[in-house]
Amino acid sequence: MHKTFYTFLMTQRNPDSTDAIAEFANNAFLDQSFPKQSKDFHELSQYLELNAGYLPTMTVFDDAWQAYLASEA
């Protein structure tokens, strides 16, 4: 994996979309504390569980993580 999860997630931003991953990306962009340099699933998951009230369900993160892994393959 060469790019960080945050870098990947920013490619999914779309302010006009109602797609769950796009909304996650839009909100993560506004989250000043998001761990932008992380490539670690557990670190990101823990951060989101404790701090990301904007994420309606962790399934959205899981789906975004799988897309991230696929993009790095």
UniProtKB/Swiss-Prot annotation:
InterPro entries associated with the record: UPF0346, YozE_SAM-like, YozE_SAM-like_sf
SUPFAM superfamilies: YozE-like (SSF140652)
Domain of life: Bacteria
UniProt signal peptide: none
Entry similarity comment: Belongs to the UPF0346 family.
NCBIfam families: PRK13672.1
Protein name, as recorded: UPF0346 protein lp_1865
